[in-house]
């Protein structure tokens, strides 16, 4: 499946990729306040939920942003809110920040993780909608996206009542269908292999696996543990990577064009180089080898 097979012209919704990326200029530093973290390989210190990070400044900017990795806060450079931060700050709470009211702050801290999950679902649904292979379920995908958008636009007290688990289950059902449709499209284009079975590594333990130059086209890698896996020069075109743990995976020279349900969070946690090929919707991390 080639990048050109992403059919943007038939999308029925008005969501754009930029709506699903962090806009820190319009956020009240929610990821630096609402979320907890503990001392680990990703964080040099611990912080409880609802406690502002010691590096958060009065203007909601990070005081060590340019040196986060050097300061032991690699986890901060990996995180992506999918646009939930600015939605909560500017839409849900109408530009009134958490410093103005302790009661409002508590609600905001609880709303943010829910909004984060909903926006992540929007990312996946938006991607599925522009895939030509998923044209047969496009109407249902669009209806589910519209419902997800509606949930993100509820009042704060209503968002807290959303059954995220049930909604995610419905979204996941459609994403699974999309994944299978993409695989059928891939299989049709494999010369002489029209009956080839899909490589299934769903939830597999592939930590540290030696997969250099592996042919993983269209593979099901949903939820696979690929921590520190050697994926140099691997062919991952059209592979389903939703939920795959790619921390410290080596993607130097790998081809991930057309891979589906891959997010910036996952890519930010990997190693890569100038020859790593990514889907157009994703950015090359600053820490990758030039």
Task: Mark where each language-model region is.
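Tandem repeat scaffolds
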Residues: 186-290
């Amino acid at each position: 499946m080639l990048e050109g097979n992403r059919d943007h012209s038939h999308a029925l919704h008005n969501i754009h990729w930029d709506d699903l990326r962090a806009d820190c200029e319009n956020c009240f530093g929610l990821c630096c306040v609402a979320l907890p973290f503990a001392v680990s390989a990703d964080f040099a210190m611990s912080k409880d939920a609802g406690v502002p990070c010691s590096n958060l400044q009065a203007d909601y900017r990070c005081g060590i942003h340019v040196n986060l990795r050097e300061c032991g806060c690699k986890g901060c450079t990996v995180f992506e809110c999918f646009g939930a931060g600015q939605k909560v700050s500017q839409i849900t709470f109408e530009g009134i920040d958490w410093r103005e009211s302790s009661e409002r702050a508590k609600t905001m801290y609880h709303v943010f993780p829910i909004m984060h999950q909903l926006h992540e679902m929007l990312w996946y649904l938006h991607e599925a909608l522009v895939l030509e292979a998923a044209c047969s379920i496009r109407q249902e995908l669009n209806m589910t996206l519209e419902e997800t958008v509606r949930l993100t636009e509820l009042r704060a007290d209503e968002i807290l009542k959303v059954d995220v688990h049930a909604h995610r289950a419905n979204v996941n059902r459609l994403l699974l269908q999309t994944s299978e449709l993409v695989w059928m499209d891939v299989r049709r284009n494999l010369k002489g292999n029209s009956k080839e079975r899909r490589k299934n590594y769903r939830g597999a333990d592939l930590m540290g696996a030696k997969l250099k130059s592996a042919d993983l086209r269209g593979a099901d890698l949903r939820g696979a543990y690929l921590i520190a896996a050697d994926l140099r020069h691997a062919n991952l075109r059209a592979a389903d990577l939703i939920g795959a743990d790619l921390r410290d995976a080596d993607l130097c020279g790998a081809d991930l064009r057309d891979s589906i349900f891959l997010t910036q969070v996952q890519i930010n946690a990997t190693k890569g180089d100038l020859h790593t090929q990514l889907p157009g919707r994703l950015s090359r991390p600053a820490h990758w080898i030039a």
